[in-house]
């Protein structure tokens, strides 16, 4: 039996706006579902997704998201199709007990994606493999306390690029 490869889960946040974005970078951001400033997606860090992240490096910041932060994002910023809030009742309808259970299952690699575009049939007594009708992005506020620099990378004192587990602090400031 072939073992399943579990890739890390990354939160990707777009920090720079639209007007001067080159066409190829805009297409990459569109594939990542980052169409506006201060939107976040949660992706599986497979090699092809990491290639897209590296290409859009100067417009985004990213890092490993933990289960507690993801549960808080789902609770406070999760939206369903039709711009309705994600509720505990919706999760329970699809076999999930709590926001924390979904977040832990995603971060641990039990499920490969958070959102399904349409209804997925759940087997009797089992939970759905994702959250049906959940929008694949989260709209966040600008960070409390502001940003350092949108021209420098995180490693040299700015805000762009890879920031590792410190992305969780930024997300909490943006909720």
UniProtKB/Swiss-Prot annotation:
GO molecular function, a single term: structural constituent of ribosome
Pfam families named among the record's database cross-references: Ribosomal_L30
GO biological process, one term: maturation of LSU-rRNA from tricistronic rRNA transcript (SSU-rRNA, 5.8S rRNA, LSU-rRNA)
InterPro entries, sorted: Ribo_uL30_ferredoxin-like_sf (IPR036919), Ribosomal_uL30 (IPR039699), Ribosomal_uL30_arc (IPR005997), Ribosomal_uL30_euk_arc (IPR035808), Ribosomal_uL30_ferredoxin-like (IPR016082)
Organism domain of life: Archaea
GO cellular component: cytosolic large ribosomal subunit
Gene3D superfamilies per UniProt: 1.10.15.30, Ribosomal protein L30, ferredoxin-like fold domain (3.30.1390.20)
Keywords from the named record: Ribonucleoprotein, Ribosomal protein
UniProt subunit comment: Part of the 50S ribosomal subunit.
Family statement: Belongs to the universal ribosomal protein uL30 family.
Protein name as catalogued: Large ribosomal subunit protein uL30
Organism of origin: Pyrobaculum neutrophilum (strain DSM 2338 / JCM 9278 / NBRC 100436 / V24Sta) (Thermoproteus neutrophilus)
Lineage: Archaea, Thermoproteota, Thermoprotei, Thermoproteales, Thermoproteaceae
